[in-house]
Design a protein with these regions (language model features):
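Thiamine diphosphate
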Residues: 1-157
Length: 158
């Protein structure tokens, strides 16, 4: 990255609610400088602080949030698997790999509807990659007009 503002960076809180508030804060800082802000927002992370969507809409903070909706807290899954491998044991009490971690499905969260209910322009769920380009074009126009936009993009669960 050539400029310090091209990338928000990492925090020890990544995956536990850091992403959305940090992105809205960065977009607020960028707003008066005319910089276009994009957040690749994970679904589990947003669930820690969904009220930040209202804050961005209320204060007209232009931000393009592209939801990486894999329907799970997969940082948790990867951590459990990593620790299990390190300790040479399987990650559940039944002695097989079985399900680990927390999925966010049944019911699936309609992030685009959540964002719309808080004043965002939103579209989704986007499940077909061919739909992503046109949706991005629409969302970019909305953000350039000074409003936040969210695309609920379904990705492959890990």
């Amino acid at each position: 990255m050539e400029k310090h503002y091209h990338w928000l960076g990492r925090s020890g809180g990544y995956g536990v609610g850091y992403g959305a508030p940090a992105s809205v804060g960065a977009a607020l800082a960028n707003r008066d400088l005319g910089r276009f802000s994009v957040s690749i927002q994970s679904d589990g992370d947003l669930m820690y602080a969904p009220g930040v969507l209202w804050t961005a809409a209320k204060h007209k903070i232009p931000l393009l949030a592209v939801m990486h909706n894999n329907r799970g807290y997969h940082q948790e899954v990867m951590h459990i698997q990593r620790l299990s491998n390190f300790r040479n044991r399987l990650p559940n009490m039944d002695g097989d790999m079985g399900p680990v971690g927390t999925s966010i499905e049944r019911p699936d969260i309609e992030y685009h509807k959540l964002a719309e209910s808080m004043g965002w322009w939103a579209k989704g769920p986007i499940k077909d990659p061919a739909q992503l380009g046109p949706a991005l074009k629409e969302a970019i126009a909305v953000v350039k007009s000074g409003q936040p936009a969210l695309l609920n993009v379904w990705t492959q669960p890990r």
